Curated annotation (Swiss-Prot):
InterPro entries: DVL, DVL/RTFL_small_peptides. Belongs to the DVL/RTFL small polypeptides family. This is Small polypeptide DEVIL 6. Small polypeptide acting as a regulatory molecule which coordinates cellular responses required for differentiation, growth and development, probably by restricting polar cell proliferation in lateral organs and coordinating socket cell recruitment and differentiation at trichome sites. Residues 9-40 are annotated as: Required for DVL/RTFL small polypeptide activity. It comes from Arabidopsis thaliana. The gene is DVL6.
Length: 40
């Protein structure tokens, strides 16, 4: 994970990092929603 982040920051700059952060947040939110649905 660290290597990927370093490559992204060096090639695409801040925009790439922000996009990666948004994608990670989206994935985490999806996981939380799925877990909550499963618990019902």
């Amino acid at each position: 994970m660290g290597v990927l982040k370093r490559r992204v920051s060096s090639s695409r700059g801040l925009g790439g990092v922000l996009r990666e952060q948004r994608a990670k947040l989206y994935i985490i939110k999806r996981c939380v929603v799925m877990l909550l649905c499963w618990q019902d």
